């Protein structure tokens, strides 16, 4: 499924960047990692990060937020994720959440509200096309992002073990 988010009117849109992103968690919640691959004109940049106590959904959001923050100027962006939560949240639910003061239809706070706000802000300068792929289905970039996320967890768990 694809979702498109339009940016405000601006001069001719510039560069087209592809972002692939994934999050992982050991336990849910538990230690987590995220990975992203940014591609522009055949060149790739890999990003990853870690959180000590988090959820898989938080890591999915963090991956895209950090990837968008890495862009130095407004771009046309295609974001590919295996997270339906992320794809549906940004394409379908976020508009109502904002209208309702970041509350759900049953008047509770939106889960991961701070991350959704950060993602919304990170999206603003860009024209974004959201793509969904099935996770662990052999999609090369998604598999790479998953490996980056898992490696971030492993790296930090090893560091924590050697500090003890």
Swiss-Prot record:
Coarse class of the protein's main subcellular location: cytoplasm
Protein's cellular compartments: Cytoplasm
Family recorded in the similarity comment: Belongs to the RNase H family.
Sorted UniProt keywords: Cytoplasm, Endonuclease, Hydrolase, Magnesium, Metal-binding, Nuclease
UniProt-listed Enzyme Commission number(s): 3.1.26.4
Functional description taken from the UniProt entry: Endonuclease that specifically degrades the RNA of RNA-DNA hybrids.
Assigned GO CC terms: cytoplasm
Gene3D superfamilies according to UniProt: Ribonuclease H-like superfamily/Ribonuclease H (3.30.420.10)
PROSITE patterns documented for this protein: RNASE_H_1
Residues annotated to bind Mg(2+) 2: 22, 146
Cofactor (UniProt): Mg(2+)
RNase H type-1 domain mapped to chain residues: 13-154
Statement: the UniProt record of this protein carries the keyword Glycoprotein: no
UniProt GO molecular function: magnesium ion binding; nucleic acid binding; RNA-DNA hybrid ribonuclease activity
Biological processes, Gene Ontology terms: DNA replication, removal of RNA primer
CDD domains with a match to the protein in the record: RNase_HI_prokaryote_like
Name this protein carries in UniProt: Ribonuclease H
Annotated catalysed reactions: Endonucleolytic cleavage to 5'-phosphomonoester
InterPro entries reported for this sequence: RNase_H, RNaseH-like_sf, RNaseH_domain, RNaseH_sf, RNaseHI
Binding site for Mg(2+) 1: 22, 60, 82
Subunit structure: Monomer.
């Amino acid at each position: 499924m694809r979702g498109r988010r339009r940016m405000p009117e601006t001069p001719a849109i510039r560069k087209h960047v592809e972002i692939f992103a994934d999050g992982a968690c050991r336990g849910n919640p538990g230690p987590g990692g995220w990975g992203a691959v940014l591609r522009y004109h055949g060149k790739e940049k890999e990003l990853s990060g870690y959180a000590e106590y988090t959820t898989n959904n938080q890591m999915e959001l963090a991956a895209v937020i950090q990837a968008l923050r890495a862009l130095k100027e407004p771009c046309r962006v295609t974001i590919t994720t295996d997270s339906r939560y992320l794809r549906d949240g940004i394409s379908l639910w976020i508009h109502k959440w904002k209208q309702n003061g970041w509350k759900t239809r049953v008047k509770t706070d939106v889960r991961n509200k701070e991350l959704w706000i950060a993602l919304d802000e990170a999206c603003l300068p860009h024209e974004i096309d959201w793509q969904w792929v099935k996770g662990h289905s052999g999609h090369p970039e998604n598999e790479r992002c998953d490996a980056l996320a898992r490696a971030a967890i492993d790296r930090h768990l090893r560091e924590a073990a050697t500090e003890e």
